[in-house]
């Protein structure tokens, strides 16, 4: 691959998630979230979790309990997703709203995990920025 960004270790240090993409594409056009096991300081086999040439993904993060979350534009809106134990991904914010930003600014974060299990998030809807709280089990955003 040509570009790598946003490496994040799982809370127990056993897995690493990151973004990658190829030239001539731009990261807001198509990226992938990759995950690999980590053992003795080395990466094991990497697998693609989400994204591709026509789907852009952003901000892979592990929740405190070790569940991978990321933002994807697969619905044409940057929504927040959670990878379920069976490998499927669930849209936690199925809204016509933007929970991500194009990756011309690396390191930007639009969500963070709270100690009570909820997720604090920033999103744009109808051109207005909002701060919300999200329950990752039931989904939906409260302002």
Positions of the model-derived regions?
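Short loop/turn segments that connect beta-strands within beta-propeller blades
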Residues: 38-41, 84-87, 135-139
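Hydrophobic beta-strand positions that form the internal "hydrophobic ladder"
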Residues: 13-16, 68-69, 119-120
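Residue-level detector of Asp-centered blade-edge/turn motifs that repeat once per structural unit
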Residues: 11-12, 63-65, 114-116
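A flexible loop/linker signature enriched in serine peptidases of the S9 family
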Residues: 1-4, 19-34, 48-58, 70-82, ...
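Beta-propeller fold detector
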Residues: 44-50, 89-96, 142-143
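Signature of short aromatic-glycine-proline-rich micro-motifs recurring in repeat-based ectodomains
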Residues: 105-114
């Amino acid at each position: 691959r040509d570009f790598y960004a946003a490496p994040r270790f799982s809370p127990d240090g056993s897995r690493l998630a990151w973004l990658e993409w190829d030239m001539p594409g731009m990261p807001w056009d198509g990226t992938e979230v990759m995950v690999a096991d980590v053992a003795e300081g080395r990466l094991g086999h990497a697998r693609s979790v989400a994204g591709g040439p026509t789907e852009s993904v952003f901000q892979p993060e592990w929740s405190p309990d070790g569940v991978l979350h990321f933002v994807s534009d697969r619905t044409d809106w940057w929504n927040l997703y959670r990878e379920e134990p069976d490998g499927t991904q669930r849209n936690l914010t199925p809204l016509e709203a933007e929970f991500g930003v194009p990756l011309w600014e690396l390191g930007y974060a639009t969500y963070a995990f709270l100690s009570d299990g909820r997720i604090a998030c920033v999103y744009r809807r109808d051109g207005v920025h909002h701060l919300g709280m999200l329950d990752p089990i039931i989904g939906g955003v409260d302002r």
